[in-house]
Amino acid sequence: MRFRSLISLLFLLFFTSSAYARFVSLNPSSTSLISDGIDGGSNLAGSGSVIKSVVSAPAEEKEEACEQTYGFMPCTKTALGNVFLILVYGFLMFTAATYLSAGSELLLEILGPGIVGGLFLPMLGALPDAMLIMVSGLSGDAATAQSQVSVGMGLLAGSTVMLLTVIWGTCTVVGKCDLRDSIAVNNQDTKGFHLKDSGVTVDIWTSYAARIMAISVIPFVIVQLPQMLGSTSGRQLSVLIALILSVLMLISYCVYQVFQPWIQRRRLAFAKHKHVISGILRHLKQHALGRLLDDEGQPDEHVIRKLFLTIDANNDGHLSAAELKALIIGISFEDIDFDKDDAVGKVLQDFDKTLDEQVDQEEFVRGIKQWLIQAMGGAPSGPEAGPRTMKFLDNFHVQTKREHALLGDNENGENDEEGGEVADPKWITIKAALLLLLGAAIAAAFADPLVDTVNNFSAATGIPSFFISFIALPLATNSSEAVSAIIFASRKKIRTASLTFSELCGGVTMNNILCLSVFLAIVYVRGLTWNFSSEVLVILIVCLVMGGFASFRTTYPLWTCFIAYLLYPFSLGLVYILDYWFGWS
């Protein structure tokens, strides 16, 4: 049904064209009628003159005709007509983004993450924005491109600001859960809109994504340096340097995305191993009555040797893999799921220095001492650090549990990204390819008409095209991503919240490097003037505020949504004041 509606809309658009008319007066006294010299009031003579006046329309009215994109797309000079066309073209761009998103998800089901998830999906997500930015600077001669390129900058700034303010704040509100020990409790939302005791928690990878997003604004700073220094020379050079850097950052980001699943698995395996260490030490503490440390705060070898004897079930002086596995199975790890055999292998790797697949008493003592020193970390040592300071083991346990949770391990084997085994890979691949091609074709076909319509609406209303593209165009190109992010966040889990905010940071990062690369390439190749100081300042402020905030914390209390929401009107007001009060543009 949706596809038929799209075809019908395209059909109407293609067979619609602009039309112009003149008001014709039949009043014989009209000055537009030419007398025949016999009867000035003759209706017949007047009618003949009317025909002549209609046939020979004035030249200035012909010049007022709007220019049709591609020579056949509809256009109009009226404000309401352009509003209608903006809605139509915006819907088509939204449809293109939806098709690209659906095709990307299907492709991800077939090929999995890695190259597809790290290389193609981020680029496909930014494709509609990149198309609009590209056509805004390629239309007409250099003077026309210079006047239209503000549409591309408005879209670039508007998309970044909308994702990090309105969408970010909304995801915080719909995804909030109760906070316990500064960590959100999955699927528990009993405290309503309490500003401090409810919020969302994300994994550590979201913090990394936020840091990358903050770093991605460096090309903006470089291209803005000549204006900051008050220099008129070197502007083209700064554009070229920023272009090269943004392309290099794009390549680096894609490589990082490709290898991130492998990095994440390594980090998660290390966190699980630390959790096993914590569990074994707490278990030994209980059996040693809390005397793992002597009066000097050092590991007590005598107690550790006694513990070895209690674990050595067959009294052969060695701990085999089976005995270590029995020890691990007997310890409660609070629903942390991990491979017991893998855990035994890592314990052997820490203890077994002779590589004989078993642990003797000396190796056990040496290994436990190293674990205790690792767990003590910054705990006090010396005479005052006796058995009473064994609380450091509990602190170490809390720390390892938190690290494990923040690394985003799937609870109970759950995976929110995978829907199971694909039934018909061949058909899914064909469907994904068709959706991607259709989405790319729609975006390419209607990007130019949308830019022209925005400029026509700006001319008809006197509203700067930047503000129109800043507010309206991101709604068209990012609506699909925004809706899916909000729906995903509403599942109220740490994992889904992490994926949601990581996607928001990733989308902004692609805007800052991919879309900016396209924009800078157009400015450099066509020799356009870079004059977007206020817009760059807004992007820097929003990215650094939200990126800095998300870089150093993994829990967002509900009150933080107000910061995000307030940044949107602040950004609009700042651009207006700088451009029209201080004349920055």
Curated annotation (Swiss-Prot):
Induction: Induced by salt stress. Induced by cold stress, heat shock and abscisic acid (ABA). Induced by calcium and magnesium chloride, and osmotic shock. The keyword tRNA processing does not apply. It is a multi-pass membrane protein. GO terms for biological process: calcium ion homeostasis; cellular response to salt stress. One of its GO terms (molecular function) is calcium ion binding. Ca(2+) 1 binds at residues 312, 314, 316, 318, 323. Disruption phenotype: No visible phenotype under normal growth conditions. No visible phenotype under short day (SD) conditions, but early flowering under long day (LD) conditions. Residues 299-334, 339-374 form the EF-hand domain. Glycans are attached at residue 478. It is found in: Cell membrane; Vacuole membrane. Its main location: membrane. The chain crosses the membrane at residues 83-103, 106-126, 149-169, 212-232, 239-259, 427-447, 457-477, 505-525, 532-552, 558-578. Gene3D superfamilies: EF-hand (1.10.238.10). Keywords: Antiport, Calcium, Calcium transport, Cell membrane, Glycoprotein, Ion transport, Membrane, Metal-binding, Repeat, Sodium, Sodium transport, Stress response, Transmembrane, Transmembrane helix, Transport, Vacuole. Ca(2+) 2 binds at residues 352, 356, 358, 363. It holds the Pfam family Na_Ca_ex. One of its GO terms (cellular component) is plasmodesma. The keyword Magnesium does not apply. InterPro entries: CaH_exchang, EF-hand-dom_pair, EF_Hand_1_Ca_BS, EF_hand_dom, NaCa_Exmemb. Belongs to the Ca(2+):cation antiporter (CaCA) (TC 2.A.19) family. This is Sodium/calcium exchanger NCL.
